[in-house]
């Protein structure tokens, strides 16, 4: 069984759709306390901090703990969740018609003592949208809860022109990566047991 260290409904939904048995325990990590100038390392450090924070005292049936964190790298600037609607609208004015890299850090702590860390990157092409469309989207409140200020699994999907890379990564969890490391960790456990 997997323990997801996240309050993200989107990550939870991905695990449900993939039929990966899981439970959820929110980490409560203060993300602002972790700094790194390298965005790829930052998301991995945040993911590891989240997984580590919930790993103490886990039930015996939990074989691994997963932490994730995402951000958008756009024109060299790191975009996490917007602070308010004004910031979300300002970002969308910049992003409209452009492209950015959605980075998701993954940290899988396996009971055998292994840590699997990865940063998965997906190129996101944003549609050229109008000010009216930006305001309509920001008014929904959806962009305030998502790294980069958009939700591919929600209303934001219509504002995305295309993707290069892992679709589920943009939602917050690379299912191909997770399946691969879970499969590898099961093989390692059966080989050592």
Curated annotation (Swiss-Prot):
Q: What is its main location?
A: cytoplasm
Q: What is the lineage of its organism?
A: Bacteria, Bacillati, Cyanobacteriota, Cyanophyceae, Synechococcales
Q: Name one Pfam family in it.
A: Maf
One Gene Ontology BP term is: nucleotide metabolic process
- One of the record's GO cellular component terms: cytoplasm
Where does it reside?
A: Cytoplasm
Provide the alphabetized UniProt keywords: Cytoplasm, Hydrolase, Nucleotide metabolism
Q: Record's PANTHER family? A: BIFUNCTIONAL DTTP/UTP PYROPHOSPHATASE/METHYLTRANSFERASE PROTEIN-RELATED, BIFUNCTIONAL DTTP_UTP PYROPHOSPHATASE_METHYLTRANSFERASE PROTEIN-RELATED
Cofactor(s) this protein cannot do without = a divalent metal cation
Going by the entry's taxonomy, the superkingdom of the source organism is recorded as: Bacteria
The active site consists of 69
Q: Which InterPro entries match?
A: ITPase-like_fam (IPR029001), Maf-like (IPR003697)
* Keyword Transmembrane helix among record annotations: no
Which reactions are catalysed by this chain? a ribonucleoside 5'-triphosphate + H2O = a ribonucleoside 5'-phosphate + diphosphate + H(+); a 2'-deoxyribonucleoside 5'-triphosphate + H2O = a 2'-deoxyribonucleoside 5'-phosphate + diphosphate + H(+)
Q: Which family does it belong to?
A: Belongs to the Maf family.
The EC number(s) this enzyme carries: 3.6.1.9
Q: Write down what this protein is called.
A: Nucleoside triphosphate pyrophosphatase
Its function, per the record, reads: Nucleoside triphosphate pyrophosphatase. May have a dual role in cell division arrest and in preventing the incorporation of modified nucleotides into cellular nucleic acids.
